[in-house]
Amino acid sequence: MNRLLSRSVQERSDERDGAAAIHLTEKAQSAQLDFTPSMQRRQANYASFVERSRKVDPAGAAGLAANLKLDPIALMKPQLAQVGLRTDNLADAYAAYWIEAWEAVHGVTGQTSREKADAVSRQSANAILATPAIAAATPAQKQELAEAMLVQAMLVAAAREQANGDEAKLAEIGRAVGKGASASGLDLRAMTLTEDGFLPAKRTGAADPAPGAEPRALAVSGEAGSRPGYGFLAAAGGAGLGAAFLMGKAMGRRG
């Protein structure tokens, strides 16, 4: 799906260049991506996320487990509502991750406008509804996918907050997030966020990635008492909790 989202960014630009009316999914259509959250299912999802992450980064998984005990999705709900996003809609959940990840990669701070958040949600909905396996997902599958994206967004936001303005750490986080997104087909460095959603960076005059800017391999975890490593963010974005990874699992079962 990430590759489909990347393609939608180019298509959005082509529509603007052709002076065509920009088609954004209507709320009635995106409502197909709503689900009624089950707290029992959420706890099962949390446990599953921790178990998967343990295979990638045992130390990071322990921290993730501690954070998930606080039910971060419930804590995110009022914050996302400020920009018009919901935790019980798959497109909104993907938009929350997409925006948070893009901001990390580009070093952007401050709250996104409701207009931008709404445009990215609709852009996400267009791509999701064009992916039959995801569009036809059961409520349980929608919840699992959405909550995976919300947990990813939480991980990125928490890492950036803990960096406490340290530019070196923030840059390292951005590289890790970009690496994870790239592994699943989403090139965040090639995009810019506008009131119409994401567009190719070149079309807006935004700076291209610097030559040789390919993210370097990051340590999976930092030394105790030292700065943290952010390889877990790359792993989560690329495979551990990514939508592509989850889709293969979720679409293989019912319920």
Regions found by a protein language model. Give the residues of each.
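An acidic intrinsically disordered interaction segment
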Residues: 48-74, 111-124, 194-210
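N-terminal Sec/ER secretory leader and immediately downstream segment
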Residues: 1-86, 90, 188
